[in-house]
């Protein structure tokens, strides 16, 4: 029944799907003899989105209009500011990878190898965001793994096959989808071996993990326990072929510039050699000259470097880039805070001087773009705490004094004269 009589003979309308009355929901939409509430509509939309996303993984990889490198780059531009060369390298590498997957079934004498990617750049330069954006664009399963938590199988900690288990969880244990996903391994530089000579002692979280990752990255049948289970000998495992999973490894590689400079300066000796002091060279400029031998000297094993043929370096973000990151991307932080304040029916204005102060603070902290949110959150904490209880506030203005901790936000009230707070 879509309608019932109330105790006071008022005709109450009910949702035909969940049975809630018109007083229990925000909106009740009528059809021929049926009603549906806003909550059921939201639930239906969620179900449709989930099913479309699942179907889209196969569709996205089999249809002829796979995004071109230029289109991939344009979408990356909407979310990631700067790092132009890295975006170009990634766009080409990802396009070639999924183009290769589309032609796997075709018989051909030439077998195309997989090109995994290594991202090198300082903290907060956009490595993780680039990988996340690519996965969202291609609509494929995606997982982020932290290399510092990994240990060799048999030791306390996560073994490398846990990465594949997380990937399976992200696509509801559908093996075919997982086998075409993207894995981002962060902090890969933290598992470098302690010296560039092969170790004779057991290094369970360094060279040992690199050896374990090597098999996964180049392609192997990973044995993963069933949904929600833990590994034990007397159980059936899910077999996942990692051959077509795209692995993107990222790390800050602190100290790699010194290794590169030491190598390049050795070759720049004698008359006519270009002499440039270490201080004159930007770290990003130095990193662009990275060679496999530098990564080996840093502590990565040669076999793993060979499985990461595409190397993209990201530079340190300057003040201008950080200010752009605050306002320009689709999901920019300032846009997010505008939306939060709009929910309270209050306009938020963050002045250019305040944006500059946020950027400078992030540079001083050496946190890059990753530190921007915590700086803004700290500056806006008090006003976000008080605002729901305050009456008549129409606008909040943030200037550089608020960011630096020397002042409080300027509040404009609805009944205040127009000149209040202006200048």
Swiss-Prot record:
Per the record, the gene is clpX
Which top-level group of life is the source organism from? Bacteria
Question: Sorted alphabetically, which keywords does the UniProt record give?
Answer: ATP-binding, Chaperone, Metal-binding, Nucleotide-binding, Zinc
Q: Which species is this record about?
A: Paraburkholderia phytofirmans (strain DSM 17436 / LMG 22146 / PsJN) (Burkholderia phytofirmans)
What does the function comment of this entry state?
A: ATP-dependent specificity component of the Clp protease. It directs the protease to specific substrates. Can perform chaperone functions in the absence of ClpP.
Q: Name one GO biological process term.
A: cell division
Q: Provide the GO MF annotations for this entry.
A: ATP binding; ATP hydrolysis activity; ATP-dependent protein folding chaperone; protein dimerization activity; unfolded protein binding; zinc ion binding
Q: Per its UniProt record, what HAMAP family does this chain match? A: ClpX (MF_00175)
Question: What is this protein identified as?
Answer: ATP-dependent Clp protease ATP-binding subunit ClpX
Segments traversing the membrane: none
List positions binding ATP.
122-129
Q: Which CDD domains match?
A: RecA-like_ClpX (cd19497)
Keyword Chaperone in record: yes
Q: Name one Pfam family in it.
A: zf-C4_ClpX
> Residues that bind Zn(2+), according to the entry?
15, 18, 37, 40
């Amino acid at each position: 029944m879509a309608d019932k009589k109330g105790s006071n003979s008022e005709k109450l309308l009910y949702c035909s799907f969940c049975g809630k009355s018109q007083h229990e929901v925000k909106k009740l939409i009528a059809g021929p003899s049926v009603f549906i509430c806003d909550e059921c509509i939201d639930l239906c939309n969620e179900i449709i989105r989930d099913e479309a996303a699942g179907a889209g993984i196969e569709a996205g990889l089999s249809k002829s209009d796979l995004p071109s490198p230029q289109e991939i780059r344009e979408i990356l531009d909407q979310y990631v500011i700067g790092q132009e060369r890295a975006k170009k390298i990634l766009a080409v590498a990802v396009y070639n990878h999924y183009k290769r997957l589309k032609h796997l079934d075709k018989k051909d004498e030439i077998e195309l190898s997989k090109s995994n990617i290594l991202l090198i750049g300082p903290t907060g330069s956009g490595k993780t965001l680039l990988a996340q954006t690519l996965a969202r664009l291609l609509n494929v399963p995606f997982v982020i793994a932290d290399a510092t938590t990994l240990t060799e199988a048999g030791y306390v900690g996560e073994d490398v096959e846990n990465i594949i288990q997380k990937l399976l969880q992200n696509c509801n244990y559908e093996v075919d989808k997982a086998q075409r996903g993207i894995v981002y391994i962060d902090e890969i530089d933290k598992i470098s071996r302690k010296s560039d000579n092969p170790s004779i002692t057991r290094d369970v979280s360094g060279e040992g993990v690199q050896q374990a990752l090597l098999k996964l990255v180049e392609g192997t049948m990973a044995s993963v326990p069933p949904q929600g289970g833990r590994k034990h000998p007397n159980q059936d495992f899910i077999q996942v072929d990692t051959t077509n999973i795209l692995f993107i490894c990222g790390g800050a590689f602190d100290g790699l510039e010194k290794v590169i400079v030491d190598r390049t300066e050795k070759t720049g000796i004698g008359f006519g050699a270009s002499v440039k002091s270490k201080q004159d060279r930007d770290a990003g400029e130095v990193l662009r000259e990275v060679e496999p031998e530098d990564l080996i000297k840093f502590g990565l094993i040669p076999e793993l470097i060979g499985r990461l043929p595409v190397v993209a370096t990201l530079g340190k973000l300057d003040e201008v880039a950080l200010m752009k990151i605050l306002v320009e991307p689709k999901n920019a932080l300032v846009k997010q805070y505008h939306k939060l304040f709009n929910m309270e029916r209050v306009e938020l204005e963050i002045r250019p001087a305040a944006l500059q102060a946020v950027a400078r603070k992030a540079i001083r902290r050496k946190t890059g773009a990753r530190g921007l949110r915590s700086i803004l959150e700290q500056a806006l904490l008090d006003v976000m705490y008080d605002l729901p209880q305050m009456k008549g506030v129409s606008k909040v203005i943030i200037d550089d004094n608020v960011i630096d901790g020397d002042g409080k936000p300027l509040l404009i009230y609805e009944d205040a004269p127009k000149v209040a707070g202006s200048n």
